[in-house]
From Swiss-Prot:
UniProt entry tagged with the keyword Repeat: yes
Record motif NPC, residues: 99-101
Lumenal-facing ranges: 36-41, 98-166, 216-234
Residues annotated as transmembrane: 15-35, 42-62, 77-97, 167-187, 195-215, 235-255
Top-level taxon: Eukaryota
Maturation and modification: Not glycosylated.
Designated name of the protein: Aquaporin-11
Domain notes: The NPC motif is essential for oligomerization and water permeability function.
Localization in the cell: Endoplasmic reticulum membrane; Cytoplasmic vesicle membrane; Cell membrane
Gene: Aqp11
Membrane topology: Multi-pass membrane protein
């Protein structure tokens, strides 16, 4: 800690935020190891792992959002952090979705039972809400000048465009991300994680200034819960319905339209 005292205040705050994120990642990793060793019932095991994964994602995103506002004049630094922590999440959160849309996709494609899907969805929503209270308690300690609990209790509207465009942006981001998630399953793990991290960074760059480009209902609930309370319909449609529609359109496209097109091309070649 003494090594930070000689640094400018802004750099100190950034280092503290990064340190807190890494501590949360390490703590959640330790908790996952203990859970895998001690929990043997599939439902309980899945609930705890999904809870821990969603908590890690939500906390790190809260801090990243804080850092992006702190250094808004240098978006390259923020995008670098998004890419780095996307890699961290990809490496540490294997086997979990941390996203209701991902669970929905697996359920529709038959990769997960409805019961297991319901358990994972419940874990994600509970974790998203719990993360807010934990972050509020931590930020109330004022470890940096940007950490104060009133910040997380206020609605900071992230939608900087009209609602129709916001819906389209979130739906397209969800469509693209889950398409990649589905079709890169056969790619080597090390390469797949980098590709998905780069894609997340690109989507954050393309749509972040308009809606935040979250394409994750649980994460949106954690980040913008006061806004859901003030304008439920608007935020529910943009951050819950739109990403879900993106996943449904992706599944319909690749399960029905593209196979039909492929078969039609084969029949034309035979003729």
């Amino acid at each position: 800690m003494s090594a930070l005292l000689g640094l400018p205040p802004e750099v100190q705050d950034t280092c503290i935020s990064l340190g807190l994120m890494l501590l949360v990642v390490l703590f959640m990793g330790l908790a996952r190891v203990i859970a895998r060793q001690q929990l043997h019932r599939p439902m309980v095991h899945a609930f705890v792992l999904e809870f821990l994964a969603t908590f890690q994602l939500c906390y790190c995103t809260h801090e990243l959002q804080l850092l992006s506002e702190q250094d808004s004049g240098h978006p390259t630094w923020t995008l670098t952090l998004i890419y780095f922590f996307s890699l961290v999440h990809g490496l540490t959160l294997v086997g979990t979705a941390s996203n209701p849309c991902g669970v929905m996709m697996q359920m529709i494609l038959g990769g997960m039972s409805p019961e297991m899907g319901a358990v994972r969805l419940m874990a994600q929503l509970v974790s998203a809400l719990c993360s807010r209270y934990c972050i509020s308690a931590l930020w109330s300690l004022s470890l940096t000048k940007y950490h104060f609990d009133e910040r997380i209790l206020a609605c900071r509207n992230p939608i900087n465009t009209d609602i129709s465009k916001a819906i389209i942006i979130e739906a397209i981001c969800s469509f693209i991300f889950h398409s990649a998630l589905l079709h890169f399953q056969e790619v080597r793990t090390k390469l797949r994680i980098h590709v998905l991290a780069a894609l997340i960074t690109f989507l954050a760059y393309a749509g972040g200034s308009l809606t935040g480009a979250l394409f994750n209902p649980a994460l949106a609930l954690s980040l913008h819960f006061p806004c859901f309370d003030e304008s439920f319909y608007k935020f529910f449609v943009v951050y819950w319905v739109a990403p879900s529609l993106g996943v449904l359109l992706m599944i319909l496209m690749f399960s029905f339209f593209l196979p039909w097109l492929h078969n039609n091309q084969l029949s034309n070649k035979k003729e």
